[in-house]
Amino acid sequence: MKTLWKHCHIASMAHGKYSIIEDAAIVTSGALIEWIGPQAELAEPEHDNCIDLGGAWVTPGLIDCHTHTVFGGNRSGEFEQRLQGVSYAEIAAAGGGIASTVRATRAASEDELYASAERRLRHLLKDGVTTVEMKSGYGLDLENERKILRVIRRLGNTQPVTVRATCLAAHALPPEYADRADDFINHICNEMLPALAAEGLVDAVDAFCEYLAFSPEQVERVFITAGQLALPVKLHAEQLSSLGGSSLAARYNALSADHLEFMTEDDAIAMAAAGTVAVLLPGAFYFLRETQLPPMDALRKHGVPIAISTDLNPGTSPGLSLRLMLNMACTLFRMTPEEALAGVTFNAAKALGMSATHGSLEVGKVADFVAWNIERPADLGYWLGGDLDKRIVRHGVESSI
């Protein structure tokens, strides 16, 4: 079915810029964009349906390219403890921190995990998100990593959103592998990843390269295994220290390296050469009250694509609004509204290996877009919270969230 969407202004985000088209129209054919441009240039169209967007600003559907949406339990109690003066070390010694999320996730059924994740996902969808990445990493054994990834696939099959599943088994050491990191990496490479990939549950492989997680040498073994399984890689890197993880990611042509507060200019040069996207996570920066800013000047100087994401997770970024992250990126990292919007559209699609089909409004791409009742595109990163008036279109069909 062909639909004409008329009477709008468009920030198409082609090439990562606003690429504004005033007084515009879009023609969709099924799930794809067939024509886009100034309405005055549109020949008398043949269409089955005509929708007047009432002068709205249209952007690509937002893409949340780094989330940990599926988990059991809730760590708001720890949040309260920390603000009462209890240290993270004390919380961890008492069984809190990531260990508590692993226990809760292992104890939860697949249906329970689905129900809680679906509630969180709904908040993102109401914010204009049409594509989301979700990671495993709170199971840390084959049975429970499989359970999380099955929930992720189920969410993608039942909710009005495109979902990419990332296996983050190399997230932390499970209790049964305490002080045996190399053995756990062997287990991931020899058993977990091959089994999960064979079941079709994995779109990409991630790891956490940090002094409190896994070394670059251990991460490299995970990357080698991912390559043997023909799976692209991503990496949590340089969040708390500089270990060269982002350069390692670049050597393996990673889709993205994420966090990056402690990355160096040499890391930026390597990422630019590899086309690896820098995914910045202002929610975690804010929630942890970090002070080391990502090296924005180096990223810009060397042309590293920059994406923004919620990092939705129970411990360090319980963020349910991607639009709020736009404001945080502008305010905390001094990104421009145009850069920030590119970070949740054009560059976010790159970070998921989806730039051929998603991330900008161009002929032949998937017709995922949002018609916002705003005065200008910068409004998306300006307003703090709230539910902006909008119409969400996914695969050429208006979606009711």
From Swiss-Prot:
Residues where N-formimidoyl-L-glutamate binds: 138, 313, 315
Keywords: Cytoplasm, Histidine metabolism, Hydrolase, Iron, Metal-binding, Zinc
Residues bound to 4-imidazolone-5-propanoate: 75, 138, 171, 239, 316
EC number: 3.5.2.7
Gene3D superfamilies on file: Metal-dependent hydrolases, Urease, subunit C, domain 1
Necessary cofactors: Zn(2+); Fe(3+)
Binding site for Zn(2+): 66, 68, 236, 311
GO cellular component entries: cytoplasm
SUPFAM superfamilies membership: Composite domain of metallo-dependent hydrolases, Metallo-dependent hydrolases
Cofactor binding note: Binds 1 zinc or iron ion per subunit.
Main EC class the enzyme belongs to: hydrolase
HAMAP family reported in the protein's UniProt record: HutI
Protein's name in the database: Imidazolonepropionase
Organism: Pseudomonas syringae pv. tomato (strain ATCC BAA-871 / DC3000)
